[in-house]
Amino acid sequence: MMDWKEAEELACKFLKKKGYKILERNYRTKYGEIDIVARDGREIVFVEVKSGSGKVDPLERIDLKKVRNLEQTARFYMIQNKLKGPARVDFVRVTPEGIDHFEGIWLG
């Protein structure tokens, strides 16, 4: 089973191949952490990476509280870096079977 660092590295490579520019990794605040901050064209994308193997889908570990913390941390990042414009939260699932990218929650 891969560890979270390996999963995040694979997710970064995957996103770069899709044309994303990685801006930051493991951004932390008192609200929470964002695994990857990237740019997709004009949009800032905050990426949560989940990995695992077995019967439980890694995405099942994302609950409403986690989503709210991600949104709050993302908003803080935008303010701290004086960024305006569209932003969203995406999820990347990394399993032994492959990588899935879910473009997700729009922040505005």
Curated annotation (Swiss-Prot):
GO molecular function: nucleic acid binding
Superkingdom of the source species: Bacteria
Pfam family, one: UPF0102
InterPro entries found in the cross-reference section: Restrct_endonuc-II-like, tRNA_endonuc-like_dom_sf, UPF0102_YraN-like
PANTHER family: UPF0102 PROTEIN YRAN
Family listed: Belongs to the UPF0102 family.
Record protein name field: UPF0102 protein TM_0253
Source organism of this protein record: Thermotoga maritima (strain ATCC 43589 / DSM 3109 / JCM 10099 / NBRC 100826 / MSB8)
